[in-house]
From Swiss-Prot:
Necessary cofactors: Zn(2+)
Positions that bind Zn(2+): H131, H135, H141
GO cellular component, one term: cytoplasm
Function as written in the Swiss-Prot or TrEMBL entry: Single strand-specific metallo-endoribonuclease involved in late-stage 70S ribosome quality control and in maturation of the 3' terminus of the 16S rRNA.
Compartment annotation: Cytoplasm
InterPro entries the UniProt entry points to: MetalPrtase_cat_dom_sf_prd, YbeY
Protein name: Endoribonuclease YbeY
Length: 165
């Protein structure tokens, strides 16, 4: 598994964010029963930068906590069975890893939302990575039923690494 973590802003957590990010990604892939070695890119940025990206890709002129850019188009969430036969271009030509996608997190939002929701920055960052990983695996939350499924899966992933509320 390859996880690229890029820090575009100063990061001052009281925990090792790289260890946490890798732990959450591994827990999510395990929970979703991904049979492949994967490549995932994570960018830690600030509100200003994520606002620009949000405006460019979603036409929303405001900062957000996390953005997900999936590389794989699933028929059904986490339906890895059809990936190899239908989307061979999603595999890195050299490593053979499934290029799942990119996650962009606003560190500013991690701090403000942790305070707002009354939990630790570690829990907030873990939640945002778990949430984004589910998007990379084809989940969405446009409908109430989809939202409930995502919430349950997020909880289960965070429970696996003892990061519940």
């Amino acid at each position: 598994m390859t996880i690229h973590i890029e820090k575009e802003t100063e990061v001052n957590f009281d925990f090792n964010e790289e260890v946490l990010i890798k732990e959450v990604i591994e827990a999510a892939l395990d929970y979703e029963e991904c049979p492949y070695e994967t490549e995932i890119n994570v960018v830690l940025t600030n509100n200003e930068e994520i606002k620009e990206i949000n405006k460019e890709y979603r036409e929303i002129d405001a900062p957000t906590d996390v953005l997900s850019f999936p590389m794989v188009e699933f028929n059904e969430p986490s339906d890895f069975e059809h990936v190899e036969e239908e989307q061979e271009d999603c595999f890195h030509p050299d490593s053979g890893e499934l290029m799942l996608g990119d996650i962009i997190v606003s560190v500013d939002k991690v701090f403000s939302q942790a305070k707002e929701f009354g939990h630790s920055e570690k829990r907030e960052l873990g939640f945002l990575i778990a949430h984004s990983m589910l998007h990379l695996c084809g989940y969405d939350h446009m409908e109430e039923e989809e939202r409930e499924v995502m919430e349950e899966r997020q909880r289960a992933i965070l429970d696996r690494i003892h990061l519940s509320r």
